[in-house]
Amino acid sequence: MTASSVHSPVRQNRTGLGMRRIRHIHFVGIGGAGMCGIAEVLANQGYIVSGSDLRESAVTRHLRDCDIRVYIGHVDEHAHGADVLVVSTAVDLENPEIRWAREHRIPVVRRAEMLAELMRFRHGIAVAGTHGKTTTTSLTSTLLAEGGLDPTFVIGGKLTSAGTNARLGEGDYLVAEADESDASFLHLQPMVSIVTNIDADHMATYAGDFARLKDTFLEFLHNLPFYGLAVLCLDDDNVRGLLPRVQRQFVTYGFAEDADYRLRDFVQRGGEVQFTAERPPGMAPLEIRLGMPGRHNALNALAAIAVASDAGVDDAAIQQGLLHFAGVGRRFQVHGHYPAPGGEGDVMLVDDYGHHPREVEMVIDAVRAGWPERRLVMLYQPHRYSRTRDLYEDFVRVLSGVDTLLLLDVYSAGESSIPGAEGRTLAGSIRQRGQVDPIFVESKQELPALLSRVLRPDDILITQGAGDIGGISLRLAAGQLDLNGMEL
């Protein structure tokens, strides 16, 4: 998959006769990770696509490059002429564009409904799970492409090799993330479903009931046709617990000895892992090298191997696809190095999107395994007050595992502040635990001076979180930010 394939030419419409009345599709919240990819694929299928978002971003600029009209701000005129509106769950239903559509009998659908329509006439592969969806979707898409199957993909992060998070392929396969955050993945009816893990997150959707969350994942699996296939991670206790209730054909994967696709002889050296992928009888084991750190990424790769093997991808193509996999934006993305303040040597700059305690813990474990002799400095921005409240003690425990912690206030993502779930309170609880003395960052303007004070030669600096801190390590690597506090 190469950067030259980013802007796919307009192709034959494959959404079938059902959408023959639809010419103009308008996205409300088009800059969102789950929205922009669907918009790009539809534009490449020949639809007129427009959209609106609250603010300008690299995503909105990219969409304009794809001949999609993007408006900044929300007013009803933006939706005029549309035959259907696609909305994300982050958008208020009192949005003026949505109100206009309802007043004029224009259908308003959720993003998952439109994704389901794209999937309807293809061999759909849906990747679900609390953690690892984006990486697993990217790996699966890469292996199918390496095998010559030319898949369409819709991913929640930028696939580095393609330079985009979506692409319209010529083949029959469509690979996409299945979002459990609002239970909208139940709209999807794929041929293959992956479940990487099930963890407590987005619990408001499930009325705080973890059993209900697990039941919803089971319902998602039962959306498979009777001839479909589920690919399930046996290392996750919650996924394993579902197996007796799954009424579709499935294969399992994991480090577990009873997994159908078993990962053994795992070794990590720096940012690369090597392992043997044992497969079901009749398929030879594969020796794998992957340029991503961590046991969790090896598991993500094993899920992709299971799907690619089922699709008949050649063994050599699987090995080459993983060997040359260039990663995903903001998933342990190494931006480069920065000269260490006041000394020889430099600081390794890493950016990661993880914002759940388990995700942060996996990043920390990957650093400890790959660079055990180096100090880990984490700049963490909590994401959502509700998540911070619900997983508070887990955050305290996990964030206590770094060497130096700089803690920003919570990125609200539109939520109101919740007493006791603020960044300053979290910093106090971590300090009280006694393993690390966190520095609470009042304002991002303080960061250059603070980083200059705490960083040492050979440190690893990780900017961690799903909010708006992702550009800091990139700006440092590009020489656009001076740790003496001056913009270059």
Swiss-Prot record:
Pathway: Cell wall biogenesis; peptidoglycan biosynthesis
Major localization class: cytoplasm
Keywords (A to Z) from UniProt: ATP-binding, Cell cycle, Cell division, Cell shape, Cell wall biogenesis/degradation, Cytoplasm, Ligase, Nucleotide-binding, Peptidoglycan synthesis
Any one GO MF annotation of this record: UDP-N-acetylmuramate-L-alanine ligase activity
Gene3D superfamilies: Mur ligase, C-terminal domain, Mur-like, catalytic domain, NAD(P)-binding Rossmann-like Domain
Highest taxon listed in the record's lineage: Bacteria
Subcellular location: Cytoplasm
Residues the entry annotates as binding ATP: G129, T130, H131, G132, K133, T134, T135
A GO term from the CC aspect: cytoplasm
Catalysed reaction, written as an equation: UDP-N-acetyl-alpha-D-muramate + L-alanine + ATP = UDP-N-acetyl-alpha-D-muramoyl-L-alanine + ADP + phosphate + H(+)
E.C. number(s) listed in UniProt: 6.3.2.8
GO-annotated biological processes: cell division; cell wall organization; peptidoglycan biosynthetic process; regulation of cell shape
Its biological purpose: Cell wall formation.
NCBIfam families per the UniProt record, alphabetical: murC (TIGR01082)
Family note: Belongs to the MurCDEF family.
Identification of the protein by name: UDP-N-acetylmuramate--L-alanine ligase
Organism: Chromohalobacter salexigens (strain ATCC BAA-138 / DSM 3043 / CIP 106854 / NCIMB 13768 / 1H11)
The encoding gene: murC
